[in-house]
Amino acid sequence: MATKTIKVTQTKSSIGRLPKHRASLLGLGLRRINHTVEVEDTPSVRGMINKVYYMVKVED
């Protein structure tokens, strides 16, 4: 059975943000603006996305 994935794109810079928010972006695998990654849809990933919702765009 295939696991569900989510596309996450960083839309804003991490410069000047809280260290925990920067760590969440790195945990998601995002490194620069307009960088897109596919991550598994798990509760921990959803939590990281919710923490930095103002800097990312999410597609199913």
UniProtKB/Swiss-Prot annotation:
One of its GO terms (cellular component) is cytosolic large ribosomal subunit. One of its GO terms (molecular function) is structural constituent of ribosome. Coiled coil: none annotated. One of its GO terms (biological process) is translation. NCBIfam families: rpmD_bact. Part of the 50S ribosomal subunit. Belongs to the universal ribosomal protein uL30 family. This is Large ribosomal subunit protein uL30. The gene is rpmD.
